[in-house]
């Protein structure tokens, strides 16, 4: 195994799995499960009390029949894992290990598994997204499990990769099949990514072109490293694989306020402030502090439990809460801040149109997941999208708008209500649905393509309401392609049922520049 990048960007798309599981793509072959809970808080416990994650479905323990899969035999190949990265224990019950170390898994549930080192015989908890089954494809540098074609392109076009950088990934369309993605360059489009379907033989082998067949994917990779043999490029090095974010601490859902050290104020909104903080001296987080009285603790906890269950790599991950007023919401830290601030910054204002389209596609992917889960955001705008160091966009504050009790916000004519982003039926009748989110997404597209300009420039809220009633829609900016503006206009249909689904919007934005081309290269 070659050396992996030591980057540990919390926003890296590869650092987390797709919904509804948590962990990086490396952990997506796991069964659904809970965080390991080793100690329940008791009434007479001294010191800070940590309340376990209420969304956990099971607890680990010696009598837990679900802690390992059926047919579990300790020490069998199924239970031996190899470390993909170094891990230094940050809790007393954790097990430190070096990349390449082998361990036998004793209990598994969710993000933390109990394991024993084969070398030292020590036992402890390990982050499941730092290991892979021994002799599995996940141990190969070039294999990216569960990654989409679009995210494969984002990875391969990221800094640190070169001509011929490649990955093999699961096929999105054919279960049990694979695709090869390769970084290429052509004078017309610049840096691009080409995709090749890897087909299977009845005998169990693999091929891209029937002229060359291989007994394993490893053999296939070695062959195309020697020469391109019909591919766009000879394979050079595996795609850079950033170190995934460590899973959140076990049993830490409702946490004590003193476990957070506030370090830098990042911004202030209508209902509180956002801070960069350190949790328990070892994990950088973002903390949203809610003004006392802005929502009831009971309503917040109920909504937070629901928000916690929405796990997707284009949604900001909710880690923990402080449930006494003032309420604190603890999430993953996103280095570039809000998309609105980023677009107005020097770096953001230089982003080319294809990157702006990519931001839009990422947000639509997260909203398509919210749509699929029958959830509603209610406050979708650039200020509520966060951006990671590697320019991954994630949706924040989903669901919070529903439980805010501030009259200036709940009264739809109030000064704090985001009129310019809100669908007419939500303004007039309080009818919030996924289709009113689609309207807001159209406004968000306009924010993105104008680099953070306020919608309906020069118009007051009452003027916007009157204009919309008379059929007014914002005109197309000069730099906005007709195809993108057409999406906005469809999002702003008067009748909610005539607006497109987020699933459809995502499909259009993902292939915005390649809709007329085959996504996969044809082999002779």
UniProtKB/Swiss-Prot annotation:
Annotated ATP binding sites: 266-274, 288
Skewed-composition ranges (Polar residues): 54-68
Protein name listed in UniProt: Tyrosine-protein kinase HCK
PTM text: Phosphorylated on several tyrosine residues. Autophosphorylated. Becomes rapidly phosphorylated upon activation of the immunoglobulin receptors FCGR1A and FCGR2A. Phosphorylation at Tyr-409 increases kinase activity. Phosphorylation at Tyr-520 inhibits kinase activity. Kinase activity is not required for phosphorylation at Tyr-520, suggesting that this site may be a target of other kinases.
Free-text tissue specificity from the UniProt record: Expressed predominantly in cells of the myeloid and B-lymphoid lineages.
Gene assigned in the entry: Hck
Swiss-Prot/TrEMBL keywords: ATP-binding, Cell junction, Cell membrane, Cell projection, Cytoplasm, Cytoplasmic vesicle, Cytoskeleton, Exocytosis, Golgi apparatus, Immunity, Inflammatory response, Innate immunity, Kinase, Lipoprotein, Lysosome, Membrane, Myristate, Nucleotide-binding, Nucleus, Palmitate, Phagocytosis, Phosphoprotein, Proto-oncogene, SH2 domain, SH3 domain, Transferase, Tyrosine-protein kinase, Ubl conjugation
Residues annotated with Phosphoserine modification: 460
SH2 domain span: 142-239
Domain named SH3: residues: 76-136
Knockout mutant characteristics: No visible phenotype, but macrophages have impaired phagocytosis. Mice lacking both HCK and FGR are extremely sensitive to infections by L.monocytogenes.
Source organism per UniProt: Mus musculus
Role: Non-receptor tyrosine-protein kinase found in hematopoietic cells that transmits signals from cell surface receptors and plays an important role in the regulation of innate immune responses, including neutrophil, monocyte, macrophage and mast cell functions, phagocytosis, cell survival and proliferation, cell adhesion and migration. Acts downstream of receptors that bind the Fc region of immunoglobulins, such as FCGR1A and FCGR2A, but also CSF3R, PLAUR, the receptors for IFNG, IL2, IL6 and IL8, and integrins, such as ITGB1 and ITGB2.
């Amino acid at each position: 195994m070659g050396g992996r990048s030591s980057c540990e960007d919390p926003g890296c798309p590869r650092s987390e799995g797709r919904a509804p599981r948590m962990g990086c793509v490396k952990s997506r072959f796991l069964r659904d499960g809970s965080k390991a809970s080793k100690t329940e808080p008791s009434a007479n416990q001294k010191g800070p009390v940590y309340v376990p994650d209420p969304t956990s479905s099971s607890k680990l323990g010696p009598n837990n029949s679900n802690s390992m899969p059926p047919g579990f035999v300790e020490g069998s190949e199924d239970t031996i894992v190899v470390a993909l990265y170094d891990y230094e224990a940050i809790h007393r019950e954790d097990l430190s290990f070096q990349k390449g170390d082998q361990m036998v898994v004793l209990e598994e549930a969710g993000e933390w598994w109990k394991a024993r080192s084969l070398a030292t015989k020590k036992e402890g908890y390990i982050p499941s997204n730092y290991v892979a089954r021994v002799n599995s494809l996940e141990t190969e540098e070039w294999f990216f499990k569960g990654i989409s074609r679009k995210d494969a392109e984002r990875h391969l076009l990221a800094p640190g990769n070169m001509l011929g950088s490649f990955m093999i990934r699961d096929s999105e369309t054919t279960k049990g099949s694979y695709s090869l993605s390769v970084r290429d360059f052509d004078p017309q489009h610049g840096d691009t990514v080409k995709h090749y379907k890897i087909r299977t033989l009845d005998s169990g082998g693999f091929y891209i072109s029937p002229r060359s067949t291989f007994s394993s994917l490893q053999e296939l990779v070695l062959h195309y490293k020697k020469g391109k043999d019909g591919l766009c490029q000879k394979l050079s090095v595996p795609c850079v694989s950033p170190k995934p974010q460590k899973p959140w601490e076990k049993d830490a859902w409702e946490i004590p306020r003193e476990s957070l050290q506030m370090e830098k104020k990042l911004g202030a909104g209508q209902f509180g402030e956002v801070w960069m903080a350190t949790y328990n001296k070892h994990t950088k987080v973002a903390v949203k502090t809610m003004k006392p009285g802005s929502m009831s603790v009971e309503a917040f906890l109920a909504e937070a439990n629901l928000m916690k269950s929405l796990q997707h790599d284009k949604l900001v991950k909710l880690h923990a809460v402080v449930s006494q007023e003032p309420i604190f919401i603890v999430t993953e830290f996103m280095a570039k801040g809000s998309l609105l601030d980023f677009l107005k910054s020097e770096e953001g204002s230089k982003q080319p149109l294809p990157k702006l389209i990519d931001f839009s596609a990422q947000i639509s992917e997260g909203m398509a997941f919210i749509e699929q889960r029958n959830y509603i955001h209610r406050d979708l705008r650039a200020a509520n999208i966060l951006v990671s160091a590697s320019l991954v966009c994630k949706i924040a504050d989903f669901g919070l708008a529903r439980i805010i009790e501030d009259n200036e916000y709940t009264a739809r004519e109030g000064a704090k209500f985001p009129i310019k982003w809100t669908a007419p039926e939500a303004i007039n009748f309080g009818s919030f649905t996924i289709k009113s989110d689609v309207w807001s997404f159209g406004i968000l597209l306009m924010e993105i393509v104008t680099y953070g300009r306020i919608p309906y420039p020069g118009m007051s809220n009452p003027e916007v309401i009157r204009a919309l009633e008379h059929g007014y829609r914002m005109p197309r900016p000069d730099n906005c392609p007709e195809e993108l503006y057409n999406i906005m206009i469809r999002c702003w249909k008067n009748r909610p049922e005539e607006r497109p689904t987020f699933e459809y919007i995502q499909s259009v934005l993902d292939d915005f520049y390649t809709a007329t081309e085959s996504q996969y290269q044809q082999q002779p």
